[in-house]
């Protein structure tokens, strides 16, 4: 994925002012920045939910800016928004089946998901509103894994989680990277530094720094 100098507006407000970043295939890249810096808007711009007015977004060699969100998703880009987007009245299994794409291999992907999140296998009949906050977050991530996505955009997966659940989520994201490329938004620097190979810092709607996470960690010591 290559994001090149995108400018995104929400109404009359100029939210992103020339954001650029690259997400190498098969690795985890993290976007860092304070609240309100433009990280979530960057994800939504990639997905076509808040389309940029200027700049390019290239995925698998194809320019995707200007395409409808549905068509972008069908190219193999999955999204895990913050705030645990699940169907709370539906069971775990129903939530997963609703995320299936036509001609997908649900059973194979379900096996992968249940190996990744054993709690979901144990609770597969329970409705989403009976799950804990951490289990709901796991289900939100799992829903994005039902299709065979090439790129997964994950927004603040550790938000509101207890330390033991953060550790479980970290292990799950590590395993995910063996299957798909990940662009992660994360405020927890310790988690981000242990997961990501590359980073981009967003500040006030601009990408101000990027590079190898290893170098950023060494600079902050």
Where are these regions (language model features)?
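Conserved structural motif at the start of ABC-family nucleotide-binding domains
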Residues: 1-3, 16
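The feature captures the beta-strand-to-loop junction immediately N-terminal to the Walker
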Residues: 32-34
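Helix-to-loop junction immediately C-terminal to a conserved catalytic motif
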Residues: 47
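Conserved ABC transporter NBD signature motif
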Residues: 55-64, 75, 108-110, 115
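Conserved ABC ATPase signature
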Residues: 127-131, 135
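A short, proline-enriched helix->beta-strand linker immediately N-terminal to the Walker B motif
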Residues: 145-150, 179
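Helical segment within the ABC ATPase nucleotide-binding domain
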Residues: 166-179
């Amino acid at each position: 994925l290559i994001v090149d100098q995108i400018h995104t507006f929400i109404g009359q407000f100029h939210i992103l002012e020339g954001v650029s970043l690259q997400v190498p295939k098969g690795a985890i890249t993290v976007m860092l920045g304070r609240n309100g810096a433009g990280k979530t808007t960057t994800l939504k711009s990639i997905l076509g939910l808040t389309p940029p007015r200027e700049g390019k977004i290239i995925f698998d060699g194809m320019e995707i800016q200007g395409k409808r969100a549905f068509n972008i998703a069908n190219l193999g880009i999955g999204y895990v928004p913050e705030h645990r987007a699940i169907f709370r009245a539906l069971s775990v299994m129903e939530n997963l089946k609703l995320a299936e794409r036509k001609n997908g291999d649900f059973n194979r992907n379900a096996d992968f998901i249940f190996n990744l999140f054993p709690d979901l296998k144990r609770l597969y009949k329970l409705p989403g509103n009976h799950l804990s906050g951490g289990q709901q977050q796991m289900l939100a991530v799992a829903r994005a894994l039902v299709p065979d996505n090439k790129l997964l955009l994950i927004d603040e997966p550790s938000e509101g989680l207890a330390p033991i659940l953060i550790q479980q989520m970290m292990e799950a994201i590590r395993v995910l990277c063996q299957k798909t490329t990940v662009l992660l938004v994360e405020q927890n620097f310790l988690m981000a530094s242990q997961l990501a190979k590359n980073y981009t810092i967003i500040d006030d709607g601009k990408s101000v720094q990027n590079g190898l996470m290893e170098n950023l960690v060494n600079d902050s010591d």
